[in-house]
Swiss-Prot record:
NCBIfam families: PRK01231.1, PRK02231.1, PRK03378.1
InterPro entries with a match to the protein in the record: ATP-NAD_kinase_N (IPR017438), ATP-NAD_kinase_PpnK-typ_C (IPR017437), NAD/diacylglycerol_kinase_sf (IPR016064), NADK (IPR002504)
Organism superkingdom: Bacteria
Cofactor(s) named in the record: a divalent metal cation
Cellular component GO terms held in the UniProt record: cytoplasm
Organism: Pasteurella multocida (strain Pm70)
Full protein name: NAD kinase
Length: 305
């Protein structure tokens, strides 16, 4: 049975004419993979757009270079080479476009990168030419800062939005409202608001629950709360979360989106977090198994008896 969060790959596969190649290489060997994959895709007959900084390093001509937004506007598939951080950074931009995304893992855990670099070409060929893959839609979060009735800052998060003081080792006092109804007050180092995708990231480190990607749910996970009764809270994914702050808090507060974008605000402001209208579309290999990924990445594997 087809899951409602998946997309018909046959219809999408036929549209794969322009492919974007993205990712920030840490080492020369990764840059070599960009070069080899670029040539391989050209030989397969695809039109290829390369993220501008990478293309310039490779010495490609201008007609192959594009920004992340331009790739989102023109391409049907984005291939990101790197770790989850690379995928997160590109995904926040690409989510507003009608484009699928798949990652080649050059990082550590690689929860968002399906392709093994050792088998990259055979796996991509099976996906692009044989259709041995599927697209899964995942929701992302939108964080906004309200000041005097106006939104002054806005950002998207694939994994999580984190409310915290700008200085480390400082506690803050805040009140959380869900759908305009008071939920709880807390004194802690901050609050992690996580998507199912982000439940295996920062939220997991703070003792939050693992949410399977298909769940329409958001996890609220406290960071070092100053009470023994505080526990993570899982709420409906369509909820609107509003956070108000005590006036005596430090004047420098932030909402961090995927630990890559920071929205600064003051104690008089209100932070709103809710599901974004944009969606991330991840392209998975046909044999993708989320529970196998969990077991492998989190060390749950044991020898069978």
């Amino acid at each position: 049975m087809k899951h409602p969060n998946t997309i018909d790959i046959k219809a999408l596969q036929s549209s794969f004419q322009i492919i974007g190649l993205l990712g920030k290489p840490r080492h020369d060997v990764t840059l070599q993979m960009h070069k080899n994959l670029f040539q391989w895709l050209l030989e397969k007959g695809y039109q290829v757009l390369v993220e501008r900084p990478i293309g310039e390093q490779l010495g490609l001509s201008e007609n192959y270079l594009a920004s992340v937004d331009e790739i989102g506007q023109q391409a049907q598939l984005a291939i990101v080479i790197g770790g989850d951080g690379n995928v997160l950074g590109r995904a926040r931009t690409l989510a507003k476009y009608d484009i699928a995304l798949i990652g080649i893992n050059r990082g550590n855990l690689g929860f968002l990168t399906d392709i093994d670099p050792k088998n990259a070409y055979s796996q991509l060929q099976a996906c692009l030419e044989d259709g041995d893959c599927f697209v899964e839609e995942r929701f992302i979060l939108e964080a906004s800062v309200e000041r005097n009735g106006k939104i002054i800052a806005r950002g998207n998060a694939v994994n999580e939005a984190v409310v915290h003081p700008a200085k480390i080792a400082h506690m803050i006092d805040f009140h959380v409202y869900i759908n305009d109804k008071f939920a709880f007050s807390q004194r802690s180092d901050g609050l992690i608001i996580s998507t199912p995708t982000g439940s295996t990231a920062y939220s997991l480190s703070a003792g939050g629950p693992i949410l399977t990607p298909q769940l329409n749910a958001i996890a609220l996970v406290p960071m070092f709360p100053h009470t023994l009764s505080s526990r993570p809270l899982v709420i409906d994914g369509d909820s609107k979360i509003s956070i108000r702050f005590a006036e005596y808090n430090t004047s420098q507060l932030e909402v961090g989106c995927d630990s890559q974008v920071a929205l600064e605000f003051s104690p008089d402001d209100i932070v709103h977090i809710q599901k974004s209208p944009d969606k991330l579309r991840l392209l998975h290999l046909k044999n993708y198994n989320y529970y196998k990924v969990l077991s492998s990445k989190l060390g749950w594997l044991r020898n069978s008896v």
